[in-house]
């Protein structure tokens, strides 16, 4: 069992425990589907990044920054971290957000060529 499937099962159990849905099977099925699609994306992107096949281009920077922001919001939702770790991730997420906006603007400008 991979780490992401464990994480998605944990998220589903939290959702059911907090009464977000009266049908637990539906929650588990939805979370499982989202987890599988995220795991496919994550493994292919990270494998190519670690193997050096994926150069640090604008789209890969956008992917990395998006993963950092998603990690921060998942920590905020779960709220099981210490205040120091949450403050560090908040700073990292804010920096990532502004870099993401800059990268998206640069990517759009490069592809369109003008305002």
Swiss-Prot record:
Any one annotated GO CC term: nuclear envelope
Main location: nucleus
Bilayer-crossing regions: 58-78, 91-111
Residues annotated as signal peptide: none
InterPro entries for the chain: APQ12 (IPR024316)
Keyword check for Thylakoid: no
UniProt KW keywords: Endoplasmic reticulum, Membrane, mRNA transport, Nucleus, Transmembrane, Transmembrane helix, Transport
Compartment(s): Nucleus membrane; Endoplasmic reticulum membrane
Listed GO biological process terms: membrane lipid metabolic process; mitotic nuclear membrane disassembly; mRNA transport; nuclear envelope organization
Keyword Transmembrane helix carried by entry: yes
Topology in the lipid bilayer: Multi-pass membrane protein
Chain's role: Involved in the regulation of lipid homeostasis in the endoplasmic reticulum, thereby impacting nuclear pore complex biogenesis and localization, and nucleocytoplasmic mRNA transport.
Family: Belongs to the APQ12 family.
Protein name: Nuclear membrane organization protein apq12
Organism: Schizosaccharomyces pombe (strain 972 / ATCC 24843)
Protein encoded by which gene: apq12
């Amino acid at each position: 069992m991979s780490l992401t499937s464990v994480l998605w099962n944990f998220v589903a159990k939290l959702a059911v425990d907090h009464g977000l849905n009266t049908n637990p099977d539906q929650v588990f099925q939805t979370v499982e589907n989202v987890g599988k699609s995220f795991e496919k994306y994550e493994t292919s992107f990270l494998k190519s990044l670690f193997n050096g096949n994926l150069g640090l281009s604008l789209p890969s920077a956008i992917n990395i920054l998006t993963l950092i922001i998603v990690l921060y919001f998942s920590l905020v939702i779960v709220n099981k971290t210490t205040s120091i770790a949450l403050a560090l991730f908040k700073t990292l997420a804010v920096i990532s957000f502004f870099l993401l906006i800059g990268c998206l603007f640069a990517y759009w400008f490069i592809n369109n060529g003008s305002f």
